[in-house]
């Protein structure tokens, strides 16, 4: 993973230890790692998960937030759903997929939390993609309906997955 030169310069001036690549970091460095809408953009998924596992301390926590292709808004917008945006999104996840992917690396899915505001934002982006216009009102109601349906199905527009390194 490469970082911008400007971001690196600012970090160094503020006294932050900095590595250009995660491979430069020692094994079991972190108690917690967070990825907010990142994992779906990573080309080599298995390699990335192995690297996360390597970097986490034993019993460390990984927090991953990703879009959920089983949500109502994904089903409503179909090919216009913003999170299906290929090639920007390489991967599309469900709860089962996340569980299986990380179990292969001996990591346990501990908890799944909804990202309720994502349905509104993703619906707005999807409206723009579908119609070419930012239809705030329609996007709001589709986002609202997505969350309402998710109260019964637990399939929110995006989920936060909390995983433990075994």
Model features per residue range: what roles?
Residues 35, 81-85, 142, 146:
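A near-ubiquitous, low-amplitude feature marking generic local secondary-structure context
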Residues 2-5, 85-90, 132-143:
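Short, Lys/Arg-enriched charge-dense amphipathic segments
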Residues 1-80, 90-104, 117, 157-165:
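Conserved SAM-binding loop
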Residues 77-86, 125-132:
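Short glycine/proline- and charge-enriched loop/turn segments
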Residues 111-166:
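A C-terminal cap/extension of S-adenosyl-L-methionine-dependent methyltransferases
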